[in-house]
Design a protein with these regions (language model features):
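Non-heme di-metal
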Residues: 2-244
Length: 244
């Protein structure tokens, strides 16, 4: 009898690891010391636009999973149980960001008033489509990327040292650096428990790669010294070859 192949989570980790170099570079560039304070303020506003969509996304995926469970979908029950727990864990993180924004010297309206950037809509909006018109299991790819590329453990001290900001302006970065590794382990354990078909595993992977691409474009945008976007073809290419 032949040995079992790599698990679903292992395949996803390998796939992301092969394609995440541009995101990691964009994140490193984003956190450089030069002009970090205004860039950090923009980062907080952008992350609020992302994070405030996450719990509603999971709530909608939970609703769909409950309906699918009634119809006998074998993924739906375990997926619904995971989403219930993760919704509780993520609730209120948008409020953390508003508090950080205020403590960093900006106004909550700086995050709440502007229309979120198209790249944020692309990141979250695709998930709504797949939840509604395909299967909520695709959302696991999105979660894997957001949890898997959380702030580094030493980032809080670097920001504080460079900007002089107080701890009250750094809660989101600090908490997510501590929490997201455990959250990612839970997600990958779920992936390995689910009776995924090859097609469903591919759905999760496509969602993850799209999320990786959108998150890369967001960090490239945030890492620019000026807020204005570069002309097309002037910036680095995204993992899918789309200019951010």
């Amino acid at each position: 009898m032949s040995a079992a192949g790599p698990s679903s989570s292992a395949r996803l980790r390998v796939t992301l690891g092969l394609l995440d170099a541009e995101l990691l570079h964009a994140m490193e560039h984003m956190w450089r010391e030069e002009d970090l304070l205004p860039r950090y303020r923009r980062y907080l506003c952008a992350m609020h636009a992302v994070v405030r969509a996450s719990v509603p996304l999971m709530e909608r995926a939970l609703e769909r999973s409950v309906r699918l469970d009634v119809c006998g979908d074998p993924l739906a029950g375990p997926l619904a149980a995971y989403l219930r727990g993760h919704i509780r864990e993520e609730a209120g993180h948008d409020v953390w960001l508003l508090e950080d924004i205020r403590a960093a010297g900006s106004l909550p309206a700086d995050a709440l008033a502007p229309m979120p950037a198209p790249v944020v809509a692309a990141l979250a909006g695709s998930q709504y489509y797949w939840i509604e018109h395909h299967h909520p299991v695709a959302l696991l790819g999105y979660i894997a990327v957001l949890e898997g590329y959380a702030p580094a453990a030493d980032l809080t001290s670097r920001i504080a040292r460079t900007t002089g900001l107080p701890d009250t302006a750094l809660r989101t970065v600090r908490e997510h650096a501590a929490l997201d590794t455990g959250h990612l382990d839970e997600l990958y354990a779920l992936l390995d428990r689910l009776p995924l078909t090859r097609g469903q595993e591919s759905d999760v992977t496509v969602s993850a790669l799209h999320s990786l691409d959108a998150l890369t474009r967001l960090f490239v945008r945030l890492g620019r010294s000026a807020a204005a976007p570069l002309p097309r073809r002037a910036g680095p290419l995204s993992p899918t070859g789309v200019t951010p």
